[in-house]
Amino acid sequence: MPPTDRDATVSALRAFFVNPPAGTVAVYLFGSVARAESAPRSDVDVAILFDQDPPRTLEGLHLGLADELQRTLGRRVDLISLNHAPADLVHRVLHDGILVCERSRSARIRFEVRLRNEYFDLEPIRKMYRRTAAQGAATH
């Protein structure tokens, strides 16, 4: 079976993150490339979990790391910190994403359990919101 874009990207990311930045707990590939639905011009979505809450801007690390990843992969990279991402985005990363590397299995699992609990705790509110929005749209 020939390697897919997903396989090649995962391999390149694993090689890139052999020595991840300090404080990295885990790295995930998510989005269209992880789902094997990417187009030639699709960007590569990468999520990083840090052991401590990084600054919201991540300017220095984020820009430098994104630039290095773009050079390595030869395509645009969208890099996010899971520490600041909304629960629904984290859920999508965990549900559809591919774990590329982890430095601390126990810290990764604690984070995943906590975020999944938050996500499912809010699910009734999301359902009610969607139902109300659909009813409002149906009356207009």
Language-model region placement:
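Catalytic core of pol beta-like nucleotidyltransferases
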Residues: M1-A26, A34-P40, D51-H140
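Short, aliphatic-rich beta-strand segments
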Residues: D45-I48
